[in-house]
């Protein structure tokens, strides 16, 4: 099934993306045979942006995308550190819209989150954003209304530094990755609510069972399958939405359109990678080239040279490469190995290099999920407590409207859950993770990780021991000391929770509509600790303030705006509450945010 899915994804590239890049920051593909709208690169201090609908053809079927200035992605916005900029955003849709400036430090009323920052932009209205640019680097912008981000409302931001940068380069290219579906995103979400593994076509088979028996033995294989079955989970379910429906894009172009970035041999090329996907993690490499990482989430880091790196949804990485040949493939495979985005660095248009095959499909283990050594205990627990619970989820969409009832699947389901087991004895055991009372007997929580750690030096599932040097969070060190300098005065611990079968997501098992705001005192320095009690990886984003990631010993390590939290991990970061107002705090997997993994953070004097 993997080969069929991959081939299908690859063949989608035979048709053209509805939009091409500009001749400025994007490189136009000279082999395009359609007249395509161009996403311009805009720079200065005054910007006019219009959000509307544009016909696109990415897979061979014409669809209506929601676009900014007619482009997918929208225009690259180039600002200068220290400038005050004004952006007039006109809404030509027949629904409310918005733009959030991801990772940008600005006043709360300029942040672009309807219901928190402002009331949103109604049809035919214009909203004027204006703020001073206080940083430099690579960032991006996107809609924060409904599921519009999935439909095309996103683009790149480049902020030129006021002072000389600590590295040299001769040329740059933005490489913006995204995922596109021809389906209506609301229909896609309904399918996930009815059957959370609807898009997972890589489930274990009889053949894989016998392969596991050969490598692990019969008893271990049966015990492993039994545990997964009792938990109503699947070790291949790494991404809720896969290449079965997604086409993976690089600067708006499908794989066979071969987006091309030009260079001259011997030049140092800065590649500004942005993951603007709704749901997809990418593993990126350029066969034949080393990549030197020089910035993460727009902030300078000590240079580290790697062969490959994983980019979580909403993260950005800047790398320097020094190509000497004629053509190199930029290969970005999805974490679940169901497809890829692809482009080329070349000395002229029309060149291409070999495209590597997808890596083998990875499988989650109990250890990955923080369940190491607990398998036999879980296999014998009582899973019956939640069988009669309501499957509606009662979730609220982020624009405040009740989601329609998604119904139930055609087959009756046993809502088994590890959250129903007795953890009272485990809480006092050495190394065992405690959990908030709100998770106990909770119909929105189907598992609890019991043995967690930061895992900062772990490249991640599917990247371990692959023969390549892979970037880890432990490699990332800011080129500056802790900008605040104070030790955190308190710690807020939050658990990332979910119920896979119901496709319900939350913090501490409390859905957004029922959750009280997280209150911060203006000026305080605090620590936020995140514990992942799910089998999914979550990129967590706090608006308006930096997230200063700590190492295992509680020391400042690297400044980011999005923190990746894999299964079975416990990661801490420091926050300075220096921005008054109401701020969004959420998982940046779009459908997880929509289904409840969202909180309001309120900074008050």
Curated annotation (Swiss-Prot):
Binding residues annotated for Cu cation 1, in chain numbering: 100, 541
Recorded superkingdom: Bacteria
One annotated Gene Ontology cellular component of this protein: periplasmic space
Residues binding Cu cation 4, per UniProt: 538, 587, 592, 597
Residue span of region 3 X 8 AA tandem repeats of D-H-X-X-M-X-G-M: 382-429
Residues at which Cu cation 3 binds: 144, 543, 586
Binding annotation for Cu cation 2: 102, 142, 588
Compartment(s) of residence: Periplasm
Cleaved signal peptide residues: 1-41
Keyword RNA-binding: no
Gene Ontology molecular function terms on file: copper ion binding; oxidoreductase activity
Residue stretches of each Sequence repeat: 382-389, 414-421, 422-429
Post-translational modification: Predicted to be exported by the Tat system. The position of the signal peptide cleavage has not been experimentally proven.
Keywords, ordered alphabetically: Copper, Metal-binding, Oxidoreductase, Periplasm, Plasmid, Repeat, Signal
Coiled coil: none
Transmembrane segments: none
Any Pfam family hit: Cu-oxidase_3
Keyword Signal: yes
NCBIfam families linked: copper_res_A, TAT_signal_seq
Family indicated by similarity: Belongs to the multicopper oxidase family. CopA subfamily.
Function of the protein: Required for the copper-inducible expression of copper resistance. May have oxidase activity.
Name of protein: Copper resistance protein A
Organism: Escherichia coli
Lineage: Bacteria, Pseudomonadati, Pseudomonadota, Gammaproteobacteria, Enterobacterales
